[in-house]
């Protein structure tokens, strides 16, 4: 059956700021306390979406979350009106305010893990929400992510959206950022590669930075998504690269159809994995980048592998890259050599995503890949699909509500909270989502 990959990109939230909340993500740590520009951030993302949609790659949007997230502060014991809580937490525990104001939901590669209908035992598209257990600010996301996905993929005859795994470290799950699918045509059955950083009975794990994904979680997600057991491979990421800042697999590898583009040090038993894939995937091609050409540290600094690998109509592939790759002499030299060689990657497109990149999120972080047949695509909420009208409407919406300068101190401003809620209220109507946010639900804003 004919199917296409649709990229659902996250809209950057109104409270996008640099707080250094994500230990193990070196860009996040390095840019802590810098002044951010939320309006520029959301527009950089929109430009990427529209350019790819105009080039013929189906594109849709996933909205931001409600931030600052007052219900979480109430759970932490802060009382009073919303405004009083903001004032108290800003004075008593500003770190908590930064955490509940994080715009991290924009990186929707961590929203869920997706199984196309061609791979599922019941023939439906499955999405399992990620619990993002390793970081407090991200562990807040799952309930609203689930509500948003149910509002987008609402036809239960075509889609199954599963709640996140229990919030315990043993089941730490980071979503599609640790998941690849390889195969031929999108509509044919593929091989799903689940990548983990640790497992309970295995002492091989990173020493410096946390391994966020457990094998136990990956196995549970594969079961929930009803992935045919004959079409699954579980592989461990190289713990040494996690300790160099590769906090998700999509910082060191990206796949599309029959191609796996990765660093030679990406996986713990890479030769064994490559041989498995060669046996299981017709026409499989591994493009392994040697450390002599691009070091792991340069790959992390430029987000070379946090790129999007997209199939064009002629069978060739386009590599969508952040501008940091073009700015790095060695990485850009390697990329120009790559597209000149005999492989499916024949073109590159560079985008300026510096607002997101400074917090440790490149092109691949900003999108959730969902393979859909034509019938399934028609069943998706049509209001989220990118086109000229939506692009114009979202830019006008951003101009109206987003600030062009934000610091950590601004997060305590009650006006920012009100601006955010008004903006999301308008957005839910624009995208026909219903009342997906806690503040929209009766009594939620009052605790």
Curated annotation (Swiss-Prot):
Keywords: Arginine metabolism, Hydrolase. It holds the Pfam family AstB. Its EC number is 3.5.3.23. It catalyses: N(2)-succinyl-L-arginine + 2 H2O + 2 H(+) = N(2)-succinyl-L-ornithine + 2 NH4(+) + CO2. Pathway: Amino-acid degradation; L-arginine degradation via AST pathway; L-glutamate and succinate from L-arginine: step 2/5. One of its GO terms (biological process) is arginine catabolic process to glutamate. Substrate binds at residues 19-28, 110, 137-138, 212, 250, 359. The active site is at 174, 248, 365 (nucleophile). One of its GO terms (molecular function) is N-succinylarginine dihydrolase activity. Catalyzes the hydrolysis of N(2)-succinylarginine into N(2)-succinylornithine, ammonia and CO(2). Homodimer. Belongs to the succinylarginine dihydrolase family. This is N-succinylarginine dihydrolase. It comes from Salmonella newport (strain SL254).
């Amino acid at each position: 059956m004919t199917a296409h990959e649709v990229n659902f990109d996250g809209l950057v939230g109104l409270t996008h700021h640099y707080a250094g909340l994500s230990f193990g993500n070196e860009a996040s740590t390095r840019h802590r306390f810098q002044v951010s520009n939320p309006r520029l951030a959301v527009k950089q993302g929109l430009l990427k979406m529209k350019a790819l949609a105009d080039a013929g790659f189906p594109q849709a949007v996933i909205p931001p979350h409600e931030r600052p997230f007052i219900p979480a502060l109430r759970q932490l014991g802060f009382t009073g009106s919303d405004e009083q809580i903001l004032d108290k937490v800003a004075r008593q525990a500003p770190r908590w305010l930064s955490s509940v104001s994080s715009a991290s939901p924009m990186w929707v590669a961590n929203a869920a893990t997706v199984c196309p209908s061609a791979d599922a035992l019941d023939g439906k598209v499955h999405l399992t929400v990620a619990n993002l257990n390793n970081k407090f600010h991200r562990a807040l996301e799952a309930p609203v992510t689930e509500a948003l996905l149910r509002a987008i993929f609402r036809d239960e005859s075509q889609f199954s959206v599963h709640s996140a795994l229990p919030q315990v470290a043993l089941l730490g799950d980071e979503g599609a950022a640790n998941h690849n699918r390889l195969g031929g045509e999108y509509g044919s059955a593929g091989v799903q590669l689940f990548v983990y950083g640790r497992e309970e009975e295995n002492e091989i794990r990173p020493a410096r930075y946390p391994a966020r994904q457990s094998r136990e979680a990956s196995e549970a997600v594969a079961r929930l998504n009803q992935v045919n057991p004959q079409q699954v491979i579980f592989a461990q990421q190289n713990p040494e690269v996690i300790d160099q800042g590769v906090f998700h697999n999509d910082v060191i590898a990206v796949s599309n159809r029959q191609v796996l583009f990765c660093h030679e040090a990406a996986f713990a038993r890479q030769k064994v994995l490559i041989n498995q894939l060669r046996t299981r995937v017709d026409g499989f091609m591994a493009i392994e980048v040697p450390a002599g050409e691009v070091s792991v540290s340069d790959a992390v600094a430029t987000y070379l592998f946090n790129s999007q690998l997209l199939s064009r109509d002629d069978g060739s592939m386009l590599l969508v890259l952040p501008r940091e790759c073009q700015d790095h002499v060695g990485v850009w030299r390697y990329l120009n050599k790559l597209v000149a060689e005999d492989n499916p990657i024949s073109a590159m497109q560079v985008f300026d995503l510096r607002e997101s990149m400074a917090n440790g999120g490149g092109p691949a972080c900003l999108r959730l890949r969902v393979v859909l047949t034509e019938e399934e695509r028609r069943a998706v909420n049509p209001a989220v699909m990118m086109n000229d009208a939506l692009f114009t409407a979202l830019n006008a919406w951003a101009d109206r509500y987003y600030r062009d300068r934000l610091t950590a101190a601004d997060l305590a401003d009650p006006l920012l909270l009100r601006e955010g809620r008004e903006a999301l209220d308008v957005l839910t109507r624009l995208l026909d989502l219903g009342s997906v946010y806690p503040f929209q639900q009766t009594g939620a804003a009052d605790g």
